Amino acid sequence: MRRHPQTATKHLFVSGGVASSLGKGLTASSLGQLLTARGLRVTMQKLDPYLNVDPGTMNPFQHGEVFVTEDGAETDLDVGHYERFLDRDLSGSANVTTGQVYSTVIAKERRGEYLGDTVQVIPHITDEIKRRIMAMAEPNADGRRPDVVITEIGGTVGDIESQPFLEAARQVRHDLGRENVFFLHVSLVPYLAPSGELKTKPTQHSVAALRSIGITPDALILRCDRDVPEALKNKIALMCDVDIDGIISTPAAPSIYDIPKVLHREELDAFVVRRLNLPFRDVDWTEWDDLLRRVHEPKETVRIALVGKYVELSDAYLSVIEAIRAGGFKHRAKVEISWVGSDDCQTDGGVASALGDVHGVLIPGGFGIRGIEGKISAISYARSRGLPVFGLCLGLQCIVIEAARSVGLTEANSAEFEPGTPDPVISTMADQEHIVSGQADLGGTMRLGAYPAVLESGSIVAEAYQSTKVSERHRHRYEVNNAYRERIAESGLRFSGTSPDGHLVEFVEYPPEQHPFVVGTQAHPELKSRPTRPHPLFAAFVKAAIDYKEGELLPVEMPERVSNGAERRDQVGQSIPEPANRG
């Protein structure tokens, strides 16, 4: 009798059917959080069926944000959910794309590694997918293997692009044995208002499509706008050949942080550990219950304006939004996001209308010239009113440009936006010049991943971190031009953090006596924030917004400027009146 090899690591695959955007990533993340709270070591992976090697060159409006890991991989935004819910760092191997798989297989064929075989989807493509899935079960740096690998299969069952990944997952179950692999399928149960009915047929057809390729799900997540009655659960269990204990109803939750509670109430985690014969303890809710109290019982509310280029799609700033909210949780505050298109801030009237009733301004990262003057105008407006400002990556660069213009460098700009500017206060990094000039690939070639920085003792950022040595993740090609540091410093802007060799500017800020909180970082600290462990810079920013709301700070006297930084001499020294409503 054939015996499957013993494996210490179990594999759980999450697929989706009927429609996209059903929340597979959040479902997988929440289940991972539950298993972790039961004392299991969990890691996660996303299989993306698109042909791009990674999302680094994709339009944010199509894909959403690019999540950068510690080791510098540009990955899917779901990897950010995984890190936040598991509260652990993942590597680039947590995201696999069709582009990566085909690139590897074709490279092997060119090297002759297939010994003249005809290279095909099965077995060569599926074998490479399986290799990457199985690699997640390898021991970590401490020599410990994960107890469970949760792998989310992107796309929808029936999509031609997803078929090789589903086939590879089927083969993993065949290779490791059914007792070591669990399939969880997320499906839609629509409600038809005219007839007042919940319809199960789409789920039945989705499971039938899954079974046609050899996969029988062990459990079904039923997405619906209401609880699915027991009678319908029994019907779905019968028609889809799934144990009734594996039929999980998941109506819309009050927040994404409530999803683990929803799944636990339906006993999904208990069903999984029993089916996979995993050792476990009862769920430890101590940390998560404290988070939920902070989410649902805030003591105050602040409004933060996010001035960005891609505000029509909130997923383009997913980690930023989660980090701001987590910063609010730290202070038992609810953060309301005011979405402000940077194009709308290019005029005095536009910026006043957009920012007149907020308590803080966040300038996120981005690329290209569109909307840049609006971001700079937003910084000038906030500076003149003592309004807290936090700049990320491009946000730091805009703070520097605004500061340079305030000391007479009226044409100061970035080489990215205006290559011919006489004052390129933001310049191309030396090792990026050949890439920007088109002599090398754009994809995967930025300054990516974790880099250290040294902070000035006593600075706002050092006080926030409670340390003068930090490490943050990066994604950029441009840097502050060191030739302009002294001139920019005349504005009062301090270069409060640099790379260890002092060459790269990593953090800037105005001293508190000049402005309560204007801080910029070349990094992306939002990528390291966790709901249970808010990033210190976001916590400090939200605290500054709370202080602004409560403190009735007086406006700072500054000359009013036109968009290119030139002063209006007839109004120099006049303070700009405080907005009537801080609300």
UniProtKB/Swiss-Prot annotation:
UniProt key word Signal: no
Activity regulation, short description: Allosterically activated by GTP, when glutamine is the substrate; GTP has no effect on the reaction when ammonia is the substrate. The allosteric effector GTP functions by stabilizing the protein conformation that binds the tetrahedral intermediate(s) formed during glutamine hydrolysis. Inhibited by the product CTP, via allosteric rather than competitive inhibition.
InterPro entries (alphabetical): Class_I_gatase-like, CTP_synthase, CTP_synthase_N, GATASE, GATase1_CTP_Synthase, P-loop_NTPase
Enzyme Commission code: 6.3.4.2
Residues of the Glutamine amidotransferase type-1 domain: 303-551
Segments traversing the membrane: none
Keywords: ATP-binding, Glutamine amidotransferase, Ligase, Magnesium, Metal-binding, Nucleotide-binding, Pyrimidine biosynthesis
Residues annotated for ATP binding in this entry: S21, L22, G23, K24, G25, L26, D78
Note: CTPSs have evolved a hybrid strategy for distinguishing between UTP and CTP. The overlapping regions of the product feedback inhibitory and substrate sites recognize a common feature in both compounds, the triphosphate moiety. To differentiate isosteric substrate and product pyrimidine rings, an additional pocket far from the expected kinase/ligase catalytic site, specifically recognizes the cytosine and ribose portions of the product inhibitor.
Protein's name according to its UniProt entry: CTP synthase
Organism name: Mycobacterium ulcerans (strain Agy99)
Gene that specifies this protein: pyrG
